[in-house]
Amino acid sequence: MGAGGLIHTWAGMGRSVTVLSVTDGEAELPARENLDRIRREELKEALRKLCATHVSVVRLGIPDGRVAEFQNKLRSAILSLIEPAMTMIAPYERDGHPDHDVVGSVCCEIARSRDIPLARYPIWTWQRADPTEFREVSWGKFPLDSEARRAKIHALQCFVSRLRPDRRERTVPRHMLNYFERSYEAFLL
């Protein structure tokens, strides 16, 4: 959601892109059978819509909601993916979702210690943000051309298990999608 346009653009430029899928979000709707498999398929289809089928996807299989318990595994996985001249894109470390916060914090720690450029994307921050939280924060905008924006919107629609308007268990409110359908992506730098 947070960096789909960037993935589309970088993949289209032939840049090496690796997506680290930390969890499958399977605990979000515990009554839903095979949610982990469904979410993996949704990610695969979303990457196809982004024209990023050659993007590497590394799955950690950490249980949803329990990333804090597996920080060493997460750290090791991230360290194993470091390449020269890379840029790291990660969830904002104060996003308000426990798994996003841990992933973002570990990425910040690694980026600082290895001098890797890091941009962090907000997801749940848009829902709950207090503007005073960002007074001292540098923001960057990654502009999306019409093709990248269209690809991102189509990719977002692949996450049916999170977005279907006819389901009681919908997890991402419709109004939140407005933040991800803009002509740019916002990153904390």
Q: What do these predicted regions represent?
A:
Residues 1-120, 154, 158:
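Active-site beta-strand->loop->alpha-helix modules in alpha/beta enzyme cores, enriched
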Residues 42, 46-50, 54, 80-81, ...:
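The feature marks non-catalytic terminal segments
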